[in-house]
Structure formats: structure tokens, C-alpha cells
Design a protein with these regions (language model features):
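Short histidine-centered loop motifs in beta-beta connectors
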Residues: 141-145, 149, 182, 186-210
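Aromatic sugar-binding surface patches on proteins
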Residues: 333-346, 426-429
Length: 460
């Protein structure tokens, strides 16, 4: 579905103490390019597989023999949620809606009579809603930050898994997907999932609304991690869950979103400007939460559906709660599917030590992130990572790539409790399977020079 292109921003540095429209040091827009999510032959095979499964499930009494003609009885919740242990305010953007213009190519119309959809010369008109991850999509995919959940209760009538999930271009590759039939006979397709992330429930099993079906990946014909959500009528016709001037049927959403659902996804602190790498390499966020007086600090904000003229007020607060600096910014571009902006600043050598706060206020919503300024010690320093931990997610043993020995290793559970500690680790492996419980763990590596680095690891 996507690969990123980034519109470079201005290369400035420094802050004005209480500036109003402060130009960013860098940033820009992120527009996922389109790719045919499912080829005609793949779609034909999927529909045949689903028909076979439905017939078998009806024979087994797991599905009704027939469904009454709509009126619609199903109401959809949003099919994506953030996994436990993560703190972004939002995790997605929308790149494409259903195409209502049957002509092709380059003849598109979404439900709002806009052009946020696509077609191609082979006759494909986009048949679903593409929901992409933002920011740092492959990083989010690798740590399984975005969970795909059942938009409505129903019965699983199809599953595909085991296909490669780091694709970067349109292709004939098969995807990983779950298909759920609802009580009114409509069917939801959840496509491009991460390999081996799918629910263990079998075809014929029931799922509740909001139940986890898998996590977002880039399997199949895809240019980056996203969910392709597609809705079908009991007779197989493509349905648009959105209602608007060019799709006048009632909305399927329990809480319909606006066409431009402008929101701030997160604010982050960086030691250097974030780097967006070429697909499928994870990005290099250069995140940090610990600084010393005199260090270079990068404050960044990440948006989806940002519109021209929408102002954000940014403020940095000192440990005593007073304002260190504040400024505002608004984009002049009509619309970005996703965007980011950052400002760089050198902290004064006399900067007060303690916990600081970076805050952004946008469209009535406040998002903030704390960072520390203080003396360098083994618990606060943040330097470029020397270690890589893989595989991640893991089922048992995690490999360490980096200098050995590690002076001390501490593993924390989601409650912040130390569940394992190892002194003077000399072998490049950690057996996390011994911890028993699946979930998100924090691995803290104390280096020989007295500094530390931390890694999040998901254990299945």
C-alpha cells in the first residue's frame, strides 16, 4: 500500500524565547503511495475459498443457512487499537477510501466526492479503507504496537497466514488476513497482517466485537505496514462503511469520523533529527528522554490529516512548572495524510536539573512528554544504541548483537518490576521464555562504561 516520501522542511536552529509563528527546523508531509491490495486472480481465489468455507460451516451448523436481506443490523467499531504498554495518542492515518467511480484509470471519487482513493489501468477500483501506521511504521509493526480488532462480532470464515510481511511494492504476493462474517451476513476483510500474529482461533470460531485478530503488517501487495479493511454484503458486493454525498447509504460506523479527522498522533523528544529509512528498514527515531545541560534537544510533533491554518501551541516547561519557551506553528499546505515537524535547541549550560515537559495543544487536545535534564549517571544517560535484540517479537530466546560482556542485564515486566537480572552476561543470548507470561518487557543493558540502553521486547 505504501512507501513514504518526506517533504523536507527548513533547516533552522534555536528557539525564540516566546515566539509566535516559529518556523520548524525540519519535517514535512508523508503521503503513502497507492498499490493494488489484491489482484483480480487473488480476489477470485479468496472468494472461492470463502464460499467453500461458508458452505462447510453451514453444514456443521456454525452459520445460519441464509441471511435475511439487509436492513443493516451491524454497527462497526474502529478496527485498530494500540497495544498495551504504548503511549501514542493516535497510531494511524487514512490514505485511501473506497473508489465509487467505476471508470478507470485516474477517475476516482471517494464517499465525500473527494479524491482520497485510487484505481489503476487494469480496472481495479480501490475496494476498502487503507489505514496506515504513523509515525515510524516498521518500528511500530516490529513491536506489534497496532492491534487489529474485530469491528463487529461474528464468525471467522477464512484465514491466511505464513506469508512474507515486509513487502514494499505492488506484487502478486499473498497476504495474511482474517475474514469475519457478521450476524446480518455481511463480511469484513482484514488484510496485510503481520506473519504469525493472527488469532489462534480456527475457522468457524466466534469472535467478539473488539477482540484481537492480529497485528498490522505489510504482507501481500503492499508498500508498507497498513490495514486494508474491506466490507462486503451477503451477496459479495463491496460496501463502503462511510456515508457522504457520494455514498448516500447509512454509515456502518457506531461513531462516524469526519472526512478530515485531524489529530496529533504523538510528541517525541530526540537527540538528533528522526531519520525515515527506505522500506523495509525500520526508521531511526533517535529518541531520547535524558539530557545534560548544554545538550542538543529536538522536539517533534506527529500528525494525521493536518490541514492548512490549524495552529499548534508548543510549550516547554521547566521542573518548577514555569515556561521555558513557547511558540506556535501551522501548516500552509491544504492537507497532509500525515506530517511531522521538529525544532532543535541547545539547552543552556545552566539549565535546571530535574523533570521537564514538552507539550503540544492542537484542536482542543493536549499531548505531552516528559524528559530529564541532569547529571550523567547510569540510570539517565541515553546514547546511540550499541545493541540489537532479535527476533522481536520472540517466543523464548532473544539474540544480542553487540559488545560482550554486558555488565548487567535487567528485565522488567509491564508493571515495572524486575523479573530477571544477570551480572556479567558473556553469551549473546537471553532466555525470556523462562518468564512464562507473554507481554511487553523492557530489557535494560548496563554497559561496561557505566551507561545504559533500553529495549522493548514482545514475548509471545
Amino acid at each position: 500500500m505504501k512507501n513514504a516520501y518526506l517533504t523536507a522542511g527548513l533547516l533552522l536552529s534555536g528557539f525564540a524565547g516566546f515566539a509566535q509563528n516559529q518556523a520548524p527546523s525540519g519535517g514535512g508531509g508523508y503521503q503513502p503511495p497507492a498499490a493494488e491490495c489484491v489482484s483480480a486472480s487473488q480476489r477470485q481465489q479468496m472468494e472461492a475459498d470463502l464460499a467453500t468455507n461458508v458452505a462447510r460451516l453451514r453444514q456443521q451448523g456454525l452459520l445460519p443457512a441464509a441471511h435475511a436481506a439487509r436492513p443493516m443490523t451491524v454497527s462497526l467499531n474502529w478496527p485498530l487499537r494500540q497495544a498495551a504498554g504504548f503511549d501514542y495518542a493516535n497510531i494511524h492515518g487514512i490514505s485511501n477510501f473506497v473508489d465509487h467511480n467505476a471508470a478507470y484509470p485516474n477517475a476516482v471519487q471517494d464517499y465525500n466526492c473527494g479524491t482520497r482513493t485510487y484505481d489503476n489501468a487494469s480496472g481495479y477500483n480501490h475496494a476498502g479503507t487503507d489505514i496506515f501506521l504513523w509515525p515510524f511504521s516498521y518500528n511500530m509493526m516490529d513491536r506489534q504496537q497496532a492491534e487489529i480488532v474485530a469491528a463487529a462480532p461474528g464468525v471467522i470464515i477464512g484465514k491466511y497466514d505464513g506469508n512474507y510481511d515486509r513487502n514494499c511494492a505492488m506484487s502478486n504476493a499473498n497476504w495474511n488476513a482474517v475474514y469475519v462474517q457478521h450476524t446480518d451476513g455481511s463480511v469484513a476483510w482484514y488484510g496485510h497482517m503481520k506473519t504469525n500474529s493472527l488469532t489462534t482461533k480456527a475457522i468457524g470460531a466466534s469472535v467478539a466485537q473488539g477482540e484481537r485478530l492480529g497485528t498490522v503488517g505489510s504482507s501481500g501487495s503492499s508498500t508498507g505496514p497498513h490495514l486494508h479493511f474491506e466490507l462486503h454484503s451477503p451477496t459479495g458486493a463491496v460496501l463502503d462503511p462511510y456515508s457522504g454525498p457520494c455514498s448516500t447509504a447509512a454509515s456502518w460506523w457506531a461513531s462516524p469520523q469526519t472526512y478530515y479527522n485531524s489529530a496529533l498522533n504523538t510528541v517525541l523528544l530526540h537527540r538528533a533529527a528522526p531519520v525515515f529509512n527506505t522500506c523495509p528498514t525500520p526508521d531511526t527515531p533517535n529518541e531520547s528522554s535524558a539530557y545534560r545541560p548544554g545538550d542538543r534537544l529536538y522536539t517533534a510533533a506527529y500528525y494525521h490529516d493536518q490541514l492548512a491554518g490549524q495552529s499548534t501551541q508548543y510549550t516547554i516547561y521547566q521542573p518548577n512548572g514555569t515556561v521555558f519557551t513557547t511558540w506556535s506553528h501551522s501548516s500552509s499546505t491544504a492537507h497532509y495524510a500525515a506530517s511531522y515537524w521538529y525544532w532543535s535547541y541547545t539547552l543552556p549550560t545552566t539549565a535546571p536539573t530535574g523533570t521537564w515537559r514538552f507539550q503540544a495543544q492542537y484542536l482542543g487536545t493536549t499531548v505531552s512528554r516528559n524528559f530529564t535534564v541532569g547529571v550523567v549517571n547510569a540510570t539517565t544517560v541515553a546514547r546511540p544504541a550499541q545493541y540489537t535484540l532479535y527476533p522481536n517479537p520472540a517466543t523464548d530466546v532473544v539474540q544480542l548483537s553487540g559488545p560482550l560482556p554486558v555488565a548487567r542485564v535487567e528485565v522488567f515486566n509491564p508493571l515495572g518490576q524486575v523479573v530477571r537480572s544477570i551480572d556479567n552476561l558473556r553469551q549473546p543470548t537471553l532466555n525470556l521464555g523462562e518468564l512464562g507470561a507473554a507481554g511487553l518487557y523492557l530489557v535494560r543493558l548496563h554497559r561496561a562504561d557505566g551507561t545504559v540502553e533500553q529495549h522493548k521486547v514482545v514475548l509471545h
